[in-house]
Amino acid sequence: MMLESLARVFKVQLPAYLKRLPIPDSIAGFIRLTVLEWLRLLPFLGVLALLGYLAIRPFLPKKKQQKDSLINLKIQKENPKVVNEINIEDLHLAKAAYCRCWRSKTFPVCDGSHNKHNELTGDNVGPLILKKKEV
């Protein structure tokens, strides 16, 4: 039953459909097609475009998948874990910004290096900002 239906589609219905399509004899004939004829051609052209894409897809360049990469590239690499301790009482400024992207040349203080890092990688890292509470 299933194979008979499939055979009917390929032997009878598909050839009949292709015969009814308004395919012009020349390229100039495409200009003379009416809107209704273009609408009748649309499904056929869509299937051809899909088959063409599926045929060339294996040859298209692959998008590089972003791997998890190291964040800290150069600061205190000899230590197994980098920890900076700052006593809050020692904060003489009303506000201080500390680096969280590991790109700062004045680490642990933020110098805005995360802006370039974010632009290049699409990341959204920012500094840790400490403020004195106003009493």
Swiss-Prot record:
Membrane topology listed for this record: Single-pass membrane protein
Ranges in the topological domain labelled Lumenal: 1-37
Compartment(s): Endoplasmic reticulum membrane; Mitochondrion outer membrane
One cellular component (GO) term of this entry: endoplasmic reticulum membrane
Domain of life of the native organism: Eukaryota
Alphabetized GO MF terms: 2 iron, 2 sulfur cluster binding; metal ion binding; protein homodimerization activity
Annotated InterPro entries: CISD1/2 (IPR045131), FeS-contain_CDGSH-typ (IPR018967), FeS-contain_mitoNEET_N (IPR019610), MitoNEET_CISD (IPR042216)
Keyword rRNA-binding: no
Protein residues bound to [2Fe-2S] cluster: C99, C101, C110, H114
A Pfam family: MitoNEET_N
Keywords, in A-Z order: 2Fe-2S, Autophagy, Endoplasmic reticulum, Iron, Iron-sulfur, Membrane, Metal-binding, Mitochondrion, Mitochondrion outer membrane, Transmembrane, Transmembrane helix
Cofactor: [2Fe-2S] cluster
Record GO biological process: autophagy of mitochondrion; regulation of autophagy
Cofactor, free-text remark: Binds 1 [2Fe-2S] cluster.
Transmembrane region(s): 38-60
SMART domains attached to this UniProt entry: ZnF_CDGSH
Subunit structure: Homodimer.
Family: Belongs to the CISD protein family. CISD2 subfamily.
PANTHER family: CDGSH IRON-SULFUR DOMAIN-CONTAINING PROTEIN 1, CDGSH IRON-SULFUR DOMAIN-CONTAINING PROTEIN 2
Name of the molecule in the record: CDGSH iron-sulfur domain-containing protein 2B
Source organism of this protein record: Xenopus laevis (African clawed frog)
Lineage, broadest ranks: Eukaryota, Metazoa, Chordata, Craniata, Vertebrata
